[in-house]
Amino acid sequence: MPHRSCRLTALITAFLLAGCASQPHAPQPQAPQHLPDGLRADVAVLETTDLHSNILSYDYYKQKADPTLGFEHTVTLIRKARGEFTNSLLFDAGDTIQGSVLADYQAQVQKIDCGQELAIYKVMDAIGYDGGTIGNHEFNYGLPFLSQVTSTPMNVDGVGAQRCAGPHYPLVLANVNSVRDGQPIFKPWTIIERKFAAFTPDGSQLSVPLKIAIIGFTPPPIMQWDKQNLEGKVTVTGVVEAAQKYMPEIEAQHPDLVIAILHGGMNTAPYTSDMENGGWYLAGVPGIDVLLLGHEHTDFPGPRFATMQDVDDQRGFVRGVPAVMGGFFGKDLGVIRLALVRQQNRWTIDKSKTFSQVWPICPPVMVGGKPTIAASNCVPADPQVQLVVGKVQQAAIDYVNTPIGQSTVRMSSYFADEGDMSALAPVNAAQIDYAQQELSSAHPELAKVPVVASAAAFRTGFGGPDDYTDVMPGPLTLRSAADLYFYPNTLTAVKIDGAGLKAWLEKSAERFNRIDPNVSGEQLLINEKYAGFNFDQIQGGVTYTIDVSKPAGQRIEKLSFRGKHITPSQTFVVVTNNYRASGGGHFPGLDGNNVVLAAPDGTREILARWLQAHPTLGTKDLPSASWHFARLKTRGTVVFTAASDKQTVAEADGLHNIRQLRDNGDGTAVYAIDLSH
């Protein structure tokens, strides 16, 4: 494993000393020593996941502090755990380097050089990690960048062999291999050695060595999601197959503990080698003692998994294996309280005394009988984190405040699920404009084929009442473009027929629950199991209605193009992003084989240039809304949740059938939508 070093500066000496002191150097391998049966050691296995480079508690889009997220608060919990537990380990389950303005700034704007360490890794090194794995979003910036910032030479086309500055803890990844030689691009597993305090049955304390094996996995669908970065360079295997391949090697080293770090969640559907969330099956691989999860942006233990087979949602076990998933954006710390006991000359887990927890940085308080997140109840940020990254953070903020124009319209996603397309219209307009120019030269045979565009609102409240796009009338900056288009996707266009277009929209309409008009009570409009970023809305002359009284797959009606019914054989070019075009979201007919344009430019950059070309943006520059709900008279009320006190926003965009019913007291409210209008 890489040697852990503490590079101190005068500014952050105390911080780094505190971080490194809490995690000892790995001891040199020693001859096996006899330890008495009955010896006990309690170890806290701590986990962060899906930090997405949210280091500081700051909302880049609203330009204000947000104490409900940020690694600087998680650090406070890590220090608390290390104070509470004599023995601890700290791991990260991936999606670490991408997902914030700061991350994009260091990767794409003021790209760090080989000798610089990425800001998120600087802070993680300062606190002291024992290991981690690679998430799917680590691949978004390409393999050369990933190789550089992780200090991992890869035998992959287009990637240099130079070793650059990277994290001081081992990164392991077992299921991504180089096409050149078939070997893993990261170490698939490694052994770390630590000395822990243990206690004999009579209460005497001993210092005992433990060998801990860690093995890492990423979601196999990365080959679809980042096809342009990975195709022809790497291959991916299923998480179970990779574990089965390397477990014999690991067991040959006789580790005391095997920890699987999966950037993935859990799914009990029949296993396939390309399963995105294979944690339930990974827990069944013999030899894995502990399972660390991620990717799903939720908590385990947590109510989402309460009905899952062979899952203990109270104590945090998956098929008998202690497991944890620690949220996202630094909102939580995963904690497994692992009770080890020495029996028959080996360490075993005392499952009766082992359990998992998720520690939130903002413990909920009860408001009106409902648990509510209150900023006043959040743990304080560790003040030293700001000292480590404050300079580059300010540079990123200054950059995204670069002016690019003016707008006379409000563009928001508060009611994007209900028909407000104001935040999607500029994205779709920019996509159509770019694609038409490129296709005219690259594919003149498509000159008469209509070009339309698809976009989804990326921020629709999943992360809380502030997790919405809201670009107010007035000056536009690069921050506005980042707010309108959150992810670093590239523009891609596909050629499909009318039947494929309808199937695309039918898949999108799974965002809604089926509404029974005869039910007299409240019915929820939104299907929360279907991600908002998969609710694609198509503009550019296409119009349609969505009948939510119909079953999924039969909801799209009156599908037309420029007033004429779309036939199944009619041809279209749909402009979207690389994620969707390559199969992301499992849309029918989208698997990367019908791509007619794979642009080198990022959608966000295309949008920013389009906004600059329209220095005073108005409604005349934007495509009109393309869909609405089919009229449906219901006996009861159809409801949904959004940010509170936004009814005037809906009305300003022409949605006069929406009214706020009740305030939840946590920044959100329940709204009613009258589908009969």
Segments from the language model and where they lie:
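Mature, solvent-exposed C-terminal subdomains and processed small-chain segments of exported/organellar
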Residues: 378-381, 497
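Glycine-rich phosphate/diphosphate-binding loops and the adjacent beta-loop-alpha structural elements
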Residues: 399-420
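Short, solvent-exposed aromatic-acidic interface loops
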Residues: 218, 351-368, 560-563
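Short, cationic low-complexity segments
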Residues: 236-242, 357-378, 595-610
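Bacterial N-terminal signal peptides that target proteins for export
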Residues: 1-10
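C-terminal motif of bacterial Sec signal peptides marking the signal peptidase cleavage site
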Residues: 17-19
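Acidic, metal/ion-coordinating pockets
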Residues: 21-357, 429-430, 434, 586, ...
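Feature captures C-terminal
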Residues: 32, 36-44, 54, 62-69, ...
